[in-house]
Every structure is written in C-alpha cells, then in structure tokens.
C-alpha cells in the first residue's frame, strides 16, 4: 500500500465513525438532526412524533456506515 492509498483509507475510516456516532446519538436522545438548508434553528426528527422518518434516518446512517466499512476492506485487500 503506497502513501496516497494509505491516506485515502484513513479518510474512509472517518465515515463509519461519523455514521455510527450519529446513529448512536439519535438512538440515545430519541431525535436525529435533520439537515435543512438555511434553517434559523436546528430541525429534529423525533422518535415519538415521527417514527417512520426517524428509523429511516437510523437505517441510512447504519447502512452508510456498513457500506463504508466494505469500501475500506475493498481498498485495503482488493485494490
């Protein structure tokens, strides 16, 4: 593995950490930050008020975390 590929893999390690951290924070707090452009205050998706959208965000964060781990394995072992 050359130096450039090492840094690419190192950056890819940050993606699952962020995704699993956001999912863990959402699970513990019962709310996930929803990204809304130009919103004056934070917008949250609450588990009690809107469970469908909340669990959709949870599945998305966990799914992206797992997929990025797969990309790391691919970059390290198969490239």
Curated annotation (Swiss-Prot):
Membrane-topology descriptor? Single-pass membrane protein
Q: Which domain of life is it from?
A: Bacteria
The alphabetized UniProt keywords are: Membrane, Transmembrane, Transmembrane helix
Localization terms from the record: Membrane
Instruction: Specify one Pfam family.
Output: DUF2542
Please give the chief subcellular localization of this protein.
membrane
Q: Where are the transmembrane segments?
A: 53-73
Mind naming one GO cellular-component term on file for this protein? membrane
Keyword Transmembrane helix in the entry? The reply is yes
Under InterPro entries, the record lists: Uncharacterised_YeiS (IPR020155)
* The protein's name: Uncharacterized protein YeiS
């Amino acid at each position: 593995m050359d130096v450039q590929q090492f840094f690419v893999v190192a950056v890819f390690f940050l993606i699952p950490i962020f995704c699993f951290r956001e999912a863990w924070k959402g699970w513990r707090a019962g709310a996930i930050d929803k990204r809304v452009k130009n919103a004056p205050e934070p917008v949250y998706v609450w588990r009690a008020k809107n469970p469908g959208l909340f669990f959709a965000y949870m599945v998305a964060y966990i799914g992206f975390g797992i997929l990025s781990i797969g990309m790391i394995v691919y970059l390290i072992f198969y490239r």
